[in-house]
């Protein structure tokens, strides 16, 4: 059974091009206004909402008067350039009507695949959320090439959801969920309200639902589900064609829930602790050990020694003074800067480095404290 959306902590909403843009008239303003009302209601209830929005190319086609036929790469990128401006303005106007600020973030594949760029992208989005702004995220279609693109915003939305530790991803589309077969082709197709695991049998049910306005079909949505569920994020596929598409979920309108097996934070920290070899080591004092065990970030003041040659965003092991690993995490400094600020208070860092740096050497969200039985000698 679906929970109420207000019971989630952080939700990523992906919006398909066909929902936002009409080929003849352009932006579907009334629909977008109804979405804005839903987002405002969720934010008022304490839920953080991020939007991954398609529509830049589709909207840019209408802005530039491009033909309905398939576009060349350079035409698509020109359409994206024009459409991104119009799309950002539309979101700013609609959300602004509810007293909500928004910020546009254009990403490429490497922004969520390369650790340092990943950390930068995540820090920017986190800051927007702390400022009560709604991040409006899209692939940077003006510069992305075939070799370095997501190819669809379903998978981009899943990457954003896992990067940000969201507990729910909602894919709004012109399809109201998953069926045992494409319902427009098979009248006997049965609707599936709940999917526990995306198996090969489930994947075989996907049909091609992409249109000339969008690149994603059901297959890409199931791919997104695998990414999200593996990282601890639940996913909902539902129709966005009705007004108030998010509140419609709470009203019981048809939707398919793909449930995650574990919590997002656990999945993220499992990735840190289990899948990455540390590129360096930090030796910390007893006060820092106590702080880490109580769930706090690692500050430079508690670091006594820095070993290794690492870059910002690399994984490092945190050792106590007896040489035992007590934690592991993603470091916010490269090795040279870490050595400079080790042992210093956070308010001294900017003067030492000559630029405004992060206060924590390892933020608690990027830190896994090992249980006593897991700690091992260096």
Swiss-Prot record:
ATP binds at residues 14, 173-174. Pfam families: AA_kinase, PUA. Its main location: cytoplasm. It is an enzyme of class 2 (transferase). It catalyses: L-glutamate + ATP = L-glutamyl 5-phosphate + ADP. It is found in: Cytoplasm. The keyword Disulfide bond does not apply. Pathway: Amino-acid biosynthesis; L-proline biosynthesis; L-glutamate 5-semialdehyde from L-glutamate: step 1/2. This is Glutamate 5-kinase. Catalyzes the transfer of a phosphate group to glutamate to form L-glutamate 5-phosphate. Substrate binds at residues 54, 141, 153.
């Amino acid at each position: 059974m679906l929970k109420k959306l207000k019971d989630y902590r952080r939700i990523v909403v992906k919006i398909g091009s066909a929902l936002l843009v009409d080929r003849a008239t352009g932006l579907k303003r009334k629909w977008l206004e109804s979405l804005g009302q839903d987002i405002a209601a969720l934010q008022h209830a304490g839920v953080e909402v991020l939007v991954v929005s398609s529509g830049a190319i589709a909207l840019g086609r209408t802005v530039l008067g491009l033909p309905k036929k398939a576009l060349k790469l350079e035409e698509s990128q020109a359409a994206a350039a024009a459409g991104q401006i119009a799309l950002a303005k539309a979101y700013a106007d609609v959300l602004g009507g509810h007293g909500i600020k928004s910020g546009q973030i254009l990403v490429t594949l490497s922004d969520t695949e390369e650790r340092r760029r990943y950390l930068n992208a995540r820090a920017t989005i986190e800051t927007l959320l702390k400022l009560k702004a709604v991040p409006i995220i899209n692939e940077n279609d003006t510069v992305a090439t075939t070799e370095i693109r997501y190819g669809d915003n379903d998978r981009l939305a899943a990457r954003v959801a896992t990067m940000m530790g969201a507990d729910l991803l909602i894919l709004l589309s012109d399809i109201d969920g998953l069926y045992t077969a494409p319902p427009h082709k098979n009248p006997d197709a049965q609707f599936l309200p709940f999917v526990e695991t995306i198996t090969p049998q489930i994947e075989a049910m996907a049909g091609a639902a992409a249109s000339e306005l969008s690149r994603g079909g059901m297959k890409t949505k199931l791919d997104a589900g695998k990414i999200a569920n593996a990282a601890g994020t639940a996913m909902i596929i539902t129709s966005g064609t009705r007004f108030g598409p998010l509140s419609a979920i709470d009203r019981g309108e048809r939707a398919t829930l793909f449930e995650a097996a574990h919590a997002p934070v656990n999945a993220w920290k499992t990735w840190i602790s289990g899948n990455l070899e540390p590129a360096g080591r930090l030796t910390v004092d007893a006060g820092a050990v106590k702080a880490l065990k109580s769930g706090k970030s690692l500050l430079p003041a508690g670091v006594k020694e820095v070993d290794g040659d690492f870059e910002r965003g690399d994984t490092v092991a945190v050792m106590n003074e007896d040489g035992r690993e007590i934690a592991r995490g993603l470091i916010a400094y490269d090795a040279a800067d870490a050595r400079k600020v080790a042992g210093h208070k956070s308010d001294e860092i900017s003067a030492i480095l000559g630029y405004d740096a992060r206060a924590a050497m390892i933020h608690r969200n990027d830190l896994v404290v090992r249980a006593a039985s897991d700690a091992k000698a260096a």
